Regions:
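Pyridoxal 5′-phosphate
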Residues: 1-231
Length: 231
């Protein structure tokens, strides 16, 4: 008998999700951007999925960008926002996923690291200290980005995202790959500006993820293509 106990790494595809997907690779495979009925059927399915995902986190459908997974979502949120908005400082923690840490290092902004306590928690005091240290450098900057993981896949720590996001007025991104589908998330109530997720972490297919982005926050970076709002 096979016993699998690493659902923090990946999960089994849910049979209902599998059945819902089945028609599209072989039967209803039209290009969603096409103008004819075959494509429009695929478009309806795509937008239904977008609406379902949006409802799960209390977002609007047009705020959901489908991606290939958490790594792409994290890189897109961090690297493209820092460039588009001329971000000077990115504030993060030392226990983030490598796709966050390396994206921060390659964002062109200065990286400020918030220490965690013995439980892996980013405390409000330590966060506020880094956010405003030195005050004349960080807090006077109109444009800086915070990226803190919502739930850690190795030690299970759930960060106080709502409280952290309410500090300082910075744009707030969270890597919620380990959280979506497992704990309640309300991006409006929690003050989240951008959120990354990956379907295979909550019984969805591999190679599929999404990025939630508050309206007007990110600029298109795929020029010449119409899929996913050019994002």
């Amino acid at each position: 008998m096979k016993i699998y106990a690493d659902n923090a790494a990946t999960t089994k595809l849910d049979i209902d999700a599998f059945e819902a997907m089945k028609p599209y690779p072989l039967e209803d495979y039209g290009n969603p951007s096409g103008a004819y009925s075959f494509s429009k059927k695929a478009k309806r399915a795509l937008e239904k999925a977008r609406k379902t995902i949006a409802e799960c986190i209390n977002a609007e459908p047009e705020q959901i960008i489908f991606t290939s997974g958490g790594t792409e979502s994290n890189n897109h949120a961090i690297k493209h926002y820092t460039v588009d908005s001329d971000v000077k400082h990115v504030i993060t923690s030392p226990i983030e996923h490598h796709s966050v840490l390396y994206a921060c290092e390659n964002s062109g902004a200065e990286v400020l690291t918030v220490p965690v306590d013995k439980y892996g928690t980013v405390t409000l005091d330590s966060f506020a200290e880094v956010l405003c240290r030195p005050r004349e450098v960080v807090c006077s900057c109109d444009s800086h980005l915070v990226t803190i993981m919502m739930a850690n896949n190795e030690i299970g720590t759930i960060q106080p995202i709502k409280e952290l996001a309410s500090c300082g007025g910075a744009v707030f991104h969270t890597d919620a790959v380990q959280a979506v589908g497992h704990i309640p998330i309300d991006v409006k109530e929690m003050g989240i500006d951008m959120l990354s997720a990956s379907a295979h972490k909550f019984n969805g297919p591999k190679g599929v993820g999404f990025l939630y982005s508050r309206n007007g926050l990110l600029q298109p970076y795929h020029h010449g293509g119409s899929q996913e709002f050019g994002m």
